[in-house]
Amino acid sequence: MASKKEQWKSDLYGDAVRDELEAFAEEGFESIPEDERDKWFTRFKFWGVFQQRTGQESYFMMRLTNANGVLEPGQLRTIAEVARDYATGPVDNPEFGNGWVDLTTRQSIQLHWLELEDIPEIWEQLESVGVTSRSAGGDTMRNITGCPVAGKDTHELVESKPLLDRFQSELREDDALSNMPRKFNISVTGCREGCAQDSINDIGLEPARKEVDGEVITGFNVRVGGGLGSRKPRVARSLDVFVADEERAYEVVRGFVELYHDHGNRDVRARARSRFFVDDWGTEKIRDRLESEYLDFELQSAGEDIRDEYTYNAGRPQSAGKSDHVGVHEQSDGRYYVGLSVAVGRLTAADALELADLADKYGSGKIRLTRRQNPIVMDVPAGALDDLLAEPLLSKHTPEPNPFQRGTVACTGTEFCSLALTETKARTARMLRWLRDNVEVPDDVHQLKIHYSGCTADCGQANTADIGLFGMRAQKDGEMVEAMDIGVGGGIGDEPSFVEWIHQRVPADEVPGAIASLVEAFAAHRTAGQTFRQWVEAEGPDAVAEYCEPIETDFEAPYMHDAKQSWYPFADEDEPPKTEQPMTSD
């Protein structure tokens, strides 16, 4: 029997939801019948509109979609103006103030504190510059990820941007495929670093070579069924398929989308993600069914991949190649791109506006977003680099961050998310400063990946980090406090692996001390040139667990209370201020 959400979606989903949402917006939030709100909020997600957590019921988050993280000239400016004018709440965040944009791990943007009544006007402003929130959430194809510098990378093996654009304009725009069994993630990359992380996507295209009729050609291998979350992560499995041209690559991906749409589990949501579909069917059966029912050509066996060259989140030393897009890098056209490091992926509206100004002044106006919650200024001439690097904004969001900031990712947390168990972003920002000031890192280590997810859904990709953190709760001194599970040794690259969880329910004020002890042990016991991931693999998780000592330090942890019991982690009041009418934006 189909789940309740499947019944709601079968009645109404996809593009048709927009008219209903706009009608509710015109009448106001209270016009949504209380006994129907779960149903409508499930449907609103397709249009990227998410109700915020308990206690914030009249406020919404909007997630945008921009395939491959590409923001054309003027788009970031408009997004920042929307954040300034509409994304302001009744209480300031002590670290970030009010009015900001959050950069995500799928190369997109989220805006918070929006009111339903403002959504149509927000859409009008965003869509006037080509920005959309369609298909940004819910059980549908989410934002397509890829190498953020596709088409500009000096070492790109396969040009992927035209294919990405086609997936965006044809596949994701197909309303007949809007209602999937669960969310569905697509990645495409032709670069040599592996930055699209095909291993943790529902379907991923990775660059490959194959000899055909005596000639070596380039194209893509196909992997399916990867994903994180619910303590049941999966590495995507090879479908044993090679596609050499754009048309066939498109058809294979579309075929798998349609196959999963038609045969994925719609009865048990906990088993509905494609990783379980691949578990149940197996890649051989999937390949056979694609050939017999969804494609009109014979599939070629997989080619030779270049995974042994992957350096992105691969746990390899810096000398092997770039592991992210932070810093100054030459483009294939002789210009440069400059990747900034934005701590925990949160840009104030003012900073986002200034970044848009700098992109216009020194580059082409184009911005691209990475899977590590960072922006890139594109197309900077060599003669403009020094002036750009001297701008005050680049002191704050530096292209030369310390190893802790460079490697850290944090999800939304209990500030807005109903699933999270802990506050994440403000705590992580404080922790980054403490680690920077108190913990020495070996000179040849330019990045330590610390990923913090507020719950086991793992939006912060903790499973793939050097040090992964899952939000939990624990008893301490007779009180319920925020806590974390600590894992070590995850990563993607040539041989993807997930963290080993070595400590459970560590009170949050003891986590910085635990991380410090890990890094100090790493520095003391590593062999020359060894990365943290390599060190964990060599030592073994049991030995590393012995080095890890959760302990209180002078780290100030003001957000220890169980935030799930409050309406907002940083509010003194028991509930948000009441208003007689929808709150106007400043």
Swiss-Prot record:
Question: What's a single GO MF annotation on this record?
Answer: heme binding
Q: What is its EC number?
A: 1.7.7.1
* Record's note on what induces expression: Repressed by the presence of ammonium as nitrogen source.
Q: What does this protein do?
A: Catalyzes the reduction of nitrite to ammonium in the nitrate assimilation pathway, using ferredoxin as the electron donor. Can use reduced methyl viologen but neither NADPH nor NADH as electron donors.
Give additional notes from the record.
Enzyme stability and activity depend upon the salt concentration.
Q: What are the start and end residues of every segment in region (Disordered)?
A: 566-586
Q: How is the cofactor bound?
A: Binds 1 siroheme per subunit.
- Its name, as the record gives it, is Assimilatory ferredoxin-dependent nitrite reductase
Q: Which residues bind [4Fe-4S] cluster?
A: C411, C417, C455, C459
Instruction: Enumerate the UniProt keywords alphabetically.
Output: 4Fe-4S, Electron transport, Heme, Iron, Iron-sulfur, Metal-binding, Nitrate assimilation, Oxidoreductase, Transport
Give the family this protein belongs to, as stated in its UniProt record.
Answer: Belongs to the nitrite and sulfite reductase 4Fe-4S domain family.
- Specify the enzyme's EC class, one word: oxidoreductase
Q: What are the TM regions of this chain, as residue ranges?
A: none
**Pathway assignment:** Nitrogen metabolism; nitrate reduction (assimilation)
Q: Say yes or no: keyword Heme present.
A: yes
- Record's superkingdom? Archaea
Protein's UniProt keywords contain Nucleotidyltransferase: no
pH dependence statement = Optimum pH is 7.5 at 60 degrees Celsius. At 40 degrees Celsius (temperature of the natural environment for H.mediterranei) the optimum pH is 6.5.
According to its UniProt record, which reaction does this protein catalyse? Answer: 6 oxidized [2Fe-2S]-[ferredoxin] + NH4(+) + 2 H2O = nitrite + 6 reduced [2Fe-2S]-[ferredoxin] + 8 H(+)
Activity: how regulated: Inhibited by cyanide and azide.
Question: So where does siroheme get bound?
Answer: C459
This protein's cofactor list reads: siroheme; [4Fe-4S] cluster
Q: How does it assemble?
A: Monomer.
The record's note on activity versus temperature states:
Optimum temperature is 60 degrees Celsius.
